Amino acid sequence: MRKIIIAIVALTVLLGACSDKSAFDLEVGDCFDDPSSFEEVESVPIKECADPHDNEVYANSTMSGTSWPGVAAVEEFADEACYTEFERYVGIAYEDSLLEFGWLVPTEASWAEVDDRTVTCIVYNLDLSKMTGSMQGVAF
């Protein structure tokens, strides 16, 4: 039960025929299409990065603390963590890129029920078109 928050623009919801992976198990380099809903994401349709896809995981950052910090604090952590990791993965500063970033973050329920502290950073095309190939080191 992860909630996706998208910086600047909302992603278009597209479905694809592929295998699903738990949102809790996403790893750097995983490529996937948009889930059917971004409210609370439990799984995403995984794609081969060589095939057209909507998103790619470029970082996972772990929040600390035992008490739920609130939505604003989670979003602030996600924005800072994903911004910081963007250039390391893509190879160009976010401000100079044609790519956008967003994130999957813990919900209050997942924080309490399954000890979810992971913020998953994702990259996607600013124009919401499909990407082909990994975005690692593309520098655009």
Q: Where are these predicted regions, by residue range?
A:
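Sec-dependent bacterial lipoprotein signal peptides
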Residues: 1-16
